Regions:
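Conserved CoA-thioester-binding segment of acyl-CoA-metabolizing enzymes
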Residues: 1-67, 285-287, 292, 298
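A structural preference for short, pocket-lining loop segments at secondary-structure junctions
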Residues: 24-32, 46-88, 107-117, 140-144
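C-terminal long alpha-helix characteristic of the crotonase
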Residues: 34, 138-143, 194-242, 255, ...
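Crotonase-fold acyl-CoA enzyme core
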Residues: 106-219
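Short cysteine-rich clusters marking metal-coordination/redox-active sites
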Residues: 296-299, 311-314
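Cys/His-rich metal-chelating microdomains
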Residues: 302, 317
């Protein structure tokens, strides 16, 4: 008889954007996109969902470790190029992407075993969601943390806005999210954002030692302790995550994400002055070319943005 909950070997899974291994009661999920600083695409999320579900159901797994490939980045958040190519054009796809992201985060947080974030490089933007979602975190001493959302037209509302104040305090959370300045691994340690900082060459040894200690917990007691410890995170998450998903979807068609993401891709500063100047002058700063209120008297086309001087349908100069 087929046993639906039987243990599956890690080699059974054919992942492309993550590495998945199970060894000595520890399951390790590695974001394997170092060429884009381990940014997370929709494909990455699908694979993470499958890996976390397997780790949750595998009774031989006692600890789950999440890390990134290489030594440059743990995770840089969502894939900016995918955002520009997919979500700016079709916001409904961003809603779908966020659904995958929320599912993956939920599975990781409720995997039923202690979780460890092995921070091997920069933790940027929504990458900090995954650090905050883990029970414990060990960082290499070269790691830097930075929240860039408000400068690239996004809000990191998939965990960071909800959980960062609970972990480091409200003032420090506001400092990270609104100032957008880097903080070092040592500063993160002093703030309680990580549990330990070690030289990069000692990172695996430290993570393995922590995992060996966590294995000694009785599994049901550890699972329920995690459930109780997650109360405030669960409460904040339940009250805001769905709202954030919808608002970020609607906002993805606005000028701010267009300018912010494009500036990030072009590796240039965000032109926040133009957005502020148009608003100060009484124009629409929410839309790239202004509100779609103009009409062409020549062909009758409607819904033309205020910033257009010519009709996009017939080419006539607008009155």
């Amino acid at each position: 008889m087929n046993e639906p909950y039987a243990r599956q070997p890690a080699s059974r899974f054919r992942f492309e954007e993550i590495l998945y291994e199970k060894k000595d009661v520890v399951a390790r999920v590695t974001l394997n996109r170092p060429e884009v600083y381990n940014a997370i695409s929709a494909q990455t999320l699908r694979e993470m969902v499958e890996a976390f579900r397997d780790a949750s159901w595998d009774d031989s797994v006692a600890v789950v470790v999440l890390t990134g490939a290489g030594d440059k980045a743990f995770c840089s958040g969502s894939d900016a190029k995918e955002f520009a190519q997919q979500f700016l054009r079709r916001p409904r796809n961003f809603w779908k992407y966020q659904g995958l992201l929320l599912e993956a985060l939920e599975l990781f947080r409720h995997v039923g075993k202690p979780t460890v974030a092995r921070l091997n490089g920069v933790v940027a933007g929504a990458g900090n969601d995954w650090n905050l979602a883990a029970d414990l975190a060990i960082a290499a001493d070269h790691v830097r943390f930075i929240q860039v959302g408000t400068r690239v037209g996004l809000v990191e509302a998939w965990g960071t806005t909800q959980w960062l104040p609970l972990v480091v305090g409200e003032r420090r959370a506001r400092e990270m999210l609104l100032k957008g300045e880097e903080i070092t691994a040592e500063q993160a340690l002093s703030w309680g954002l990580v549990n330990e900082v070690v030289p990069y060459k000692q990172l695996d040894r430290a993570v393995n030692a922590l995992a060996a200690r966590l294995v000694q917990n009785l599994p049901e007691c550890a699972r329920y302790a995690r459930q109780q410890l997650g109360f405030w995170k669960d409460l904040a998450w339940a009250m805001t995550a769905g709202h954030a998903r919808d608002w970020l979807t609607v906002h993805s068609t606005a000028w701010e994400p267009y300018e912010g993401v494009q500036a990030f891709i072009d590796k240039r500063p965000t032109d926040y002055k133009s957005i502020r100047s148009r608003a100060a002058a009484g124009g629409s700063s929410e839309s790239l070319w202004g509100a779609p209120t103009r009409k062409c008297e020549n062909c009758g086309a409607k819904g033309i943005p205020e910033g257009f001087d010519y009709c996009g349908k017939c080419g006539s100069k607008l009155q």
